[in-house]
A protein has these predicted regions:
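Extreme N-terminal segment that seeds HTH/winged-HTH DNA-binding domains in transcriptional regulators
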Residues: 1-11, 15
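Mg2+-dependent phosphoryl-transfer enzymes with acidic/Ser/Thr/Gly-rich catalytic loops
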Residues: 2-6, 22-23, 183-277
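Active-site phosphate-binding/coordination module
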Residues: 21-120
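Hydrophobic packing residues within well-ordered alpha-helices of enzyme cores
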Residues: 26, 51-55, 159, 163, ...
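Residue-level signal for inorganic ion chemistry
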Residues: 33, 44, 68, 147, ...
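Short active-site oxyanion
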Residues: 35-41, 60-62, 146, 207-209, ...
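Short, structured coil segments at secondary-structure junctions
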Residues: 57-60, 68, 167-170, 224-225, ...
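Conserved acidic, metal-coordinating active-site core of Asp-based
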Residues: 95, 99-221, 233
Length: 277
């Protein structure tokens, strides 16, 4: 049996429901995990300031992994940030503008979007509770840990394959984040690296880690934890890369596994779960 001590979960299309809402019993579940000395981390492409506003009742219990691993905060202390070089993201901004896509510079305190794309404000505010609209993104001087591209037509995978992967993959960490987003971070920055760093800091081995996700920006995280779960609604090719499947997010699949873990006192073995392949 393995005793789980650290759990990380993606949010959109994983922990959250179809309306981007948390399960109603999420807060008491995390508190019950904490009582068993099990840490819970929200691992998201959203920034830290948005995550803090999402979990006001769990600021002491939860670890926050923001911007796909670009920043980590626990109990009010920022443990890690990976600031992108300005010359790098300015080049990305020009490339995105030429392609006709929407660039989002993820600053540590706010997101920056060019004013010509203010029509997408409702979409931006779903993920970035602070957005500053500027005339020219390349003129921004604030530190940033992620550069995100919004694809309104839902063609993120195609844009990644044709343009952003080949053009940026050698210099940056690039990942598709659902149908509408491509995320770009410093090389080596992803949710899996953040989870591994947390494991080192807390002295928790991979065999005592559990993780949940649905798409490609979760892949390394699901491979880092021994108990990595792809929710059933997740990207099909990832089933070959992860050990286990959880029920889909609309059935609160993450919560089903967490409740099973609690019922077993925090101890599990691989035979307890449905294999992904």
């Amino acid at each position: 049996m393995d005793r789980i001590r650290l759990i990380a979960s993606d949010l959109d299309a994983t922990l959250l429901d179809a309306h981007s809402q948390l399960p109603p019993d999420f807060v008491p579940t995390v508190k019950a995990l904490a009582a068993l000395d099990i840490h819970f981390a929200a691992a998201s492409g959203r920034p830290l300031y948005t995550l803090e506003e999402m979990f006001p009742a769990l600021r002491r219990e939860m670890i926050l992994i923001g911007d796909n691993g670009g920043a980590v905060r626990w109990n009010g202390e920022t443990l890690f940030t990976s600031e992108m070089p300005p010359e790098g993201w300015r080049t990305l901004a020009r490339k995105t503008r030429q392609a006709g896509d929407v660039a989002v510079l993820c600053g540590l305190e706010t997101a920056y979007v060019e004013r010509q794309y203010q029509q997408y404000d409702a979409v931006m505010k779903q993920f970035y509770t602070r957005v500053d609209y500027v005339d020219d993104l390349t003129a921004v001087t604030a530190p940033a840990d992620k550069f995100t591209i919004y694809l309104p037509r839902g063609n993120a995978q195609e844009a990644f394959d044709a343009l952003y992967g080949p053009a940026c993959g050698a210099e940056f960490s690039v990942a598709v984040a659902g149908k509408n987003w491509v995320d770009i971070m410093n090389p080596g920055v992803h949710k899996g690296a953040a989870l591994a760093a947390l494991g080192q800091k807390l002295d928790i081995p991979a065999g005592s880690m559990m993780a949940f996700g649905d798409t490609y920006n979760d892949a390394e995280m699901l491979e880092t934890a021994r108990y990595g779960f792809l929710v059933e609604n997740g990207s099909l090719p990832l089933r070959q890369r992860v050990p286990f499947l959880a029920p889909p997010h609309w059935e609160q699949g993450v919560m089903q596994v967490l409740k099973q873990l609690l019922a077993q006192g925090g101890a599990v073995c691989p035979e307890d779960f449905r294999p992904a392949h």
